[in-house]
Amino acid sequence: MLSILLTLLLSKYALGHEVWFSETFPNESIENWVQSTYNAEKQGEFKVEAGKSPVDPIEDLGLKTTQDARFYGIARKISEPFSNRGKTMVLQFTVKFDKTVSCGGAYIKLLGSDIDPKKFHGESPYKIMFGPDICGMATKKVHVIFNYKGKNHLIKKEIPCKDDLKTHLYTLIVNPNNKYEVLVDNAKVEEGSLEDDWDMLPPKKIDDPNDKKPDDWVDEQFIDDPDDKKPDNWDQPKTIPDMDAKKPDDWDDAMDGEWERPQKDNPEYKGEWTPRRIDNPKYKGEWKPVQIDNPEYKHDPELYVLNDIGYVGFDLWQVDSGSIFDNILITDSPDFAKEEGERLWRKRYDAEVAKEQSSAKDDKEEAEETKERKELPYDAKASDEPSGDHDEL
């Protein structure tokens, strides 16, 4: 018991940095996680598994979705609810798709301590939602959503996610200066400020409602060329009588009326004439009202602050199951998170790449052997076949 407490203490304050949460799924136990029973008939089941072709059957264990076309909800309580006030917060995890995903979320959520994990679902309030989301060709992105004053705010930038079948590492760093970074596979893919890249605050500047466009403002960029004249021979009818048409032999003017030639398209017809367009010498550009300070804007130096973080959870809809979540870490040290990412993710990813390359090489060699065999003369092929003769006993 003492050794367990010591391990927990060391993990929380490892080497001078704080670890608020860590989960590496060292065995197949799922007892620390609570699966949601909300809308139970549509809920899929999470299991701790290593997937179809793990690099290491123990190291690769993770929280896996197991049923197609299901909602998923699961959460684990953080031993001590925390706030990131005055500190950097790093949220990191790995995800591997065990099969090709046509549509499915693979993002993590941080939840308040007042959540009921058994009733956890898509409308449950959360602090942060972070991670990949794939649906068809249109959606392949990393979500970064903050809840600010009760409203969820999506990042205004597009961050592409990985959609292959290898393990990938996703990292979000939120700093106390309201700056953030997003890393994929320990490489920075986006950074900026919470104020600029989310609409959590009203804009600093707005249009002056009292500013009016001057009466003589010209905002028409192009005008008709006054010197361009319509050619004299332009006006030709759209259709003309077909001179090759013949009056039917059985046409009776008394009964059928006077026969008229049918119309056909006129090859000389040029359509409606319009003068060419030229730059307007009086054009002043697009008029915009003067910008003034927004009286509704108020700087908030604590946009980054998330209080009472009490649960880690996954709330997903997946058409294609098989997502494996692992190596979940919440810490105040980007350096420690990077080290852990390299230690836990890198060797697995490199092994998966090597395995993929080896498989591709084997497939190529097999295809070449098959091709060579097909190109052999018939006699050569026959000589390779086992003989049908048998020695007599």
Curated annotation (Swiss-Prot):
Residues 189-253 are annotated as: 4 X 12 AA approximate repeats. An alpha-D-glucoside binds at residues 107, 109, 126, 133, 315. Sequence repeats lie at residues 189-200, 208-219, 225-236, 242-253, 257-267, 271-281, 285-295. It comes from the Eukaryota. Its main location: endoplasmic reticulum. The keyword Disulfide bond applies. The keyword Ribonucleoprotein does not apply. Residues 1-16 form the signal peptide. Pfam families: Calreticulin. Glycans are attached at residue 27. Residues 257-295 are annotated as: 3 X 11 AA approximate repeats. One of its GO terms (cellular component) is endoplasmic reticulum membrane. Keywords: Calcium, Chaperone, Disulfide bond, Endoplasmic reticulum, Glycoprotein, Lectin, Metal-binding, Repeat, Signal, Zinc. It is found in: Endoplasmic reticulum lumen. GO terms for molecular function: calcium ion binding; carbohydrate binding; unfolded protein binding. InterPro entries: Calret/calnex, Calret/calnex_CS, Calreticulin, Calreticulin/calnexin_P_dom_sf, ConA-like_dom_sf. GO terms for biological process: ERAD pathway; protein folding. A motif (Prevents secretion from ER) lies at residues 390-393. Residues 194-277, 351-393 are annotated as: Disordered. Can be divided into a N-terminal globular domain, a proline-rich P-domain forming an elongated arm-like structure and a C-terminal acidic domain. The P-domain binds one molecule of calcium with high affinity, whereas the acidic C-domain binds multiple calcium ions with low affinity. The interaction with glycans occurs through a binding site in the globular lectin domain. Belongs to the calreticulin family. Molecular calcium-binding chaperone promoting folding, oligomeric assembly and quality control in the ER via the calreticulin/calnexin cycle. This lectin may interact transiently with almost all of the monoglucosylated glycoproteins that are synthesized in the ER. This is Calreticulin. It comes from Schistosoma mansoni.
